[in-house]
């Protein structure tokens, strides 16, 4: 087999492939064995017609289609590997010559992975928020835990107040018609939590156990269901139970109950350390996002549409998987959100293009710097996967090799190292954390 290629557009090439007549003959023989099973000719049992008679009766072309289906995929893949071409879409195949006793000649036109023109990616100037955990942060964390470990007691005669937890049945109506999905029984709601439509919870303040109330609300203009935006609704609500929240005092006993520490002071120190670690990770993540974003902005690449379309499909699959964790599927979501697959794909396009460009630019940096994954790093990554999957590392490695995913794993490790390079080479200025603006910490740079 021989093949050549030429560039016919920025991200499109044409492969010209010639397969020798011996391989063509082998493919024709395979095609004959398939076709003969379907042919009936008087004087011969079905499937027993000699090839020469078959070709004389129907012409040698009767085998060409099946032979081409055998030869072209094989030869196309061999040509890609020979010239180290990375296609990003299915090829357009044009058969130039297919004759018995002659080589097969065909052209394959396909869009390929684009070339990236890297800009500046070292010495990028970025900012990092100063990591600082205050006493107020620690106290807020304790209050959240206090809320989580609150105890509730039934209210027999009193009225519901903000902070109380109610068990209710409700039915919702718009223009006298039931709202789809607007009914529930034994639903838990905490007054003042703003979980429901604005105005709903407020009208239940002062209610008593066993009381039935009519609650009137207006759906917000930005409500996710298009059919309910701005609509007035009535909910028939029955208050079945009222439970009053009792907060445990934050003291040494509280620390013992909710942690492994004996004193509140020890517990607070642990919280402070954890918050500092979380804040440091968040600050580092911001630095990473900044350097990658700037590297992307400085690079130039023309992304083929098939790559964006493929990433959109990947994002839709990821979204579908996340829905499944909540017991939903795409069809149900489309109905609830009054949308469809085309609208979702359109919504994903911008993010998909950014994701594709990110991968292309980071791969280009990896190649430019000669970054690879070491055997130690590969083993470490496999051990992490094995630990998460509660499997033996050898079995995970064997599985990855069987699936042909080892090269993908190596590439992912190398890409992460490329991001680390951007961070290590960046000029980082530490700034004070502020809601309105960030003031530079004088003389404090990394």
UniProtKB/Swiss-Prot annotation:
InterPro entries assigned: PPIase_dom_sf, PPIase_FKBP_dom, Trig_fac, Trigger_fac_C, Trigger_fac_C_sf, Trigger_fac_ribosome-bd_bac, Trigger_fac_ribosome-bd_sf, Trigger_fact/SurA_dom_sf
Molecular-function annotations in GO: peptidyl-prolyl cis-trans isomerase activity; protein folding chaperone; ribosome binding
Enzyme class: isomerase
Chain ranges passing through the membrane: none
The protein's Enzyme Commission number: 5.2.1.8
Gene Ontology annotations for the cellular component aspect, listed alphabetically: cytoplasm
UniProt cross-references to Pfam families, sorted A to Z: FKBP_C, Trigger_C, Trigger_N
Keywords on record: Cell cycle, Cell division, Chaperone, Cytoplasm, Isomerase, Rotamase
GO biological process assignments: 'de novo' cotranslational protein folding; cell division; chaperone-mediated protein folding; protein transport; protein unfolding
Lineage top rank: taxon: Bacteria
NCBIfam families: tig
Entry comment, domain topic: Consists of 3 domains; the N-terminus binds the ribosome, the middle domain has PPIase activity, while the C-terminus has intrinsic chaperone activity on its own.
Function: Involved in protein export. Acts as a chaperone by maintaining the newly synthesized protein in an open conformation. Functions as a peptidyl-prolyl cis-trans isomerase.
PANTHER family: TRIGGER FACTOR CHAPERONE AND PEPTIDYL-PROLYL CIS/TRANS ISOMERASE, TRIGGER FACTOR-LIKE PROTEIN TIG, CHLOROPLASTIC
Name this protein carries in UniProt: Trigger factor
Gene field: tig
């Amino acid at each position: 087999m021989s093949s050549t290629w030429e560039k016919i557009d920025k991200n499109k090439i044409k492969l010209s492939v010639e397969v020798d007549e011996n391989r063509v003959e082998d493919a024709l023989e395979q095609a004959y064995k398939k076709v003969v099973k379907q042919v009936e000719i008087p004087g011969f049992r079905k499937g027993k017609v000699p090839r020469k008679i078959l070709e004389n009766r129907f012409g040698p072309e009767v085998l060409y289609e099946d032979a081409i289906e055998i030869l072209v995929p094989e030869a196309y893949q061999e040509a890609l590997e020979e010239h180290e071409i990375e296609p990003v879409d299915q090829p357009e195949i044009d058969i130039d010559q297919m004759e018995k006793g002659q080589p097969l000649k065909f052209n394959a036109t396909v869009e390929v992975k684009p070339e990236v023109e890297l800009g500046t990616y070292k010495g990028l100037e970025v900012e990092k928020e100063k990591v600082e955990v205050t006493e107020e942060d620690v106290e807020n964390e304790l209050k959240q835990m206090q809320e989580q470990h609150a105890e509730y007691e039934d209210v027999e005669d009193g009225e519901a107040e903000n902070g109380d937890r109610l068990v209710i049945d409700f039915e919702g109506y718009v223009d006298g018609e039931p709202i789809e999905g607007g009914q529930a029984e034994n639903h838990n709601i905490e007054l003042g939590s703003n979980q429901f439509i604005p105005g709903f919870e407020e009208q239940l303040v002062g209610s008593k156990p066993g009381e039935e109330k009519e609650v009137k609300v207006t759906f917000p203009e930005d409500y996710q269901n298009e059919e309910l935006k701005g609509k007035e609704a009535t909910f028939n609500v029955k208050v079945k139970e009222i439970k009053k929240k009792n907060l445990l005092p934050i003291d040494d006993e509280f620390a013992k109950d909710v942690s492994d520490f004996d004193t509140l002071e020890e517990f607070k120190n642990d919280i402070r350390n954890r918050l500092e670690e979380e804040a440091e990770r968040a600050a580092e993540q911001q630095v990473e996002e900044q350097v990658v974003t700037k590297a992307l902005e400085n690079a130039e690449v023309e992304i083929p549409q098939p790559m964006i379309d493929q990433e959109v499909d990947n994002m839709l699959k990821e979204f579908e998987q996340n829905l499944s964790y909540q017991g939903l599927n795409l069809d149900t979501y489309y109905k609830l959100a009054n949308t469809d697959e085309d609208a979702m794909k359109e919504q994903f396009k911008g993010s998909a293009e950014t994701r594709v460009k990110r991968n292309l630019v980071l791969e280009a940096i990896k190649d430019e710097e000669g970054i690879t994954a070491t055997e130690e790093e590969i083993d470490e990554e496999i051990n992490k996967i094995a630990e998460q999957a509660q499997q033996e590392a050898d079995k995970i490695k064997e599985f990855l090799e069987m699936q042909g995913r080892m090269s993908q794993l190596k590439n992912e490790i190398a890409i992460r190292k490329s991001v680390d390079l951007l961070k290590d080479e960046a000029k980082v200025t530490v700034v004070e954390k502020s809601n309105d603006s960030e003031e530079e910490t004088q003389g404090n740079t990394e």
